[in-house]
Regions:
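Sequence-specific dsDNA recognition surfaces
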Residues: 10-31, 45-74, 231
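Juxtamembrane/interface motifs at transmembrane-helix termini
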Residues: 27-31, 45, 74-75, 134-138, ...
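ATP-grasp fold ATP-binding core
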Residues: 42
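A generic structural signal for residues embedded in beta-strands
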Residues: 79-80
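Non-catalytic DNA-recognition/assembly elements of restriction-modification systems
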Residues: 1-25, 146-231
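Basic, amphipathic alpha-helical recognition segments used for DNA target recognition
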Residues: 8-16, 47-54, 70, 74, ...
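Short, charged beta-turn/beta-strand-edge "cap" motif at the junction between a beta-strand
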Residues: 84-87
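A short, glycine/Asx- and small/polar-enriched loop/turn
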Residues: 35-38, 143
Length: 231
């Protein structure tokens, strides 16, 4: 675990883009047909596993020209933060998202987008738990910024990503359920987290731990960590 680090999400994301919805009465802003100057306009319902580039609706050039600063570049990580919480995907091309999606451009010198996407998928129970449930569940940038992200060097991240992608492909071929993927994610990140918790590389603040990690920490506490036995 020597190569592992922990940082808040705010320190590994170089740019945040929260989407919007243009005036739906402006028919010239929207199209169902992709074209050379249009961009996909992603909503939560468009988010599938892996890369996202095809959407139900697209913004025309006229629409895109209204919000050029909100164009999400290829490779950004997408996270649903309103209504349906915690779905994740990666922008497979330049696109625009609506207000229910938070796009994050990661510092790829620290974290690979695919690793970040899988990590957020693993962390989804915590995201759902923390969402502001008034009428519609919602997560703010401030809430996301403090998420503790645990990550190894880029080479090890790629190994983890390759293993998880292979497991996902096998799962899809055998038509296994989403629960199977959740178990795979928990196995991949849970073992790592257990070691990191033991060594103090993950914050032991139970308020910051995901519902998946919290039971691991509680079980470790009851058995007393080595560092605690020394004090």
């Amino acid at each position: 675990m020597e190569n592992w680090k922990q940082k808040p999400l705010s320190q590994v994301v170089s740019r945040w883009i929260r989407g919007t919805t243009l005036n739906r009465s402006r028919a010239d802003y929207y199209t169902k047909t992709p074209g050379p100057e249009s961009l996909p306009w992603a909503r939560v319902g468009d988010m599938k596993e892996g890369l996202l580039c095809e959407t139900e609706n697209y913004l025309t050039k006229e629409g895109v020209d209204q919000i050029p600063w909100l164009i999400v570049p290829e490779g950004a990580v997408l996270l649903s933060v309103s209504g349906t919480i915690g779905k994740s995907a990666i922008a497979g091309c330049d696109l625009v998202v609506n207000q229910a999606i938070q796009a994050m451009i990661f510092d790829e010198g620290q974290i690979l987008p695919e690793y970040a996407c899988f990590y957020l998928e693993f962390y989804r129970p915590w995201l759902i738990e923390r969402a502001n449930a008034v009428t519609v569940p919602n997560l703010t940038k401030e809430q996301l910024s403090g998420i503790p992200v645990v990550f190894p060097c880029l080479e090890e991240q790629q190994v983890i990503v390759d293993q998880l992608k292979r497991a996902r492909r096998l799962m899809q071929r055998s038509r296994r359920s989403e629960d199977t993927l959740n178990r795979i994610l928990e196995n991949a990140f849970g073992k790592m987290a257990r070691s990191a918790l033991k060594e103090g590389k993950i914050s032991r603040d139970e308020e910051l731990l995901s519902p998946v990690l919290r039971p691991i920490w509680v079980s470790l506490k009851t058995r007393a960590l080595p560092a605690e036995r020394e004090t």
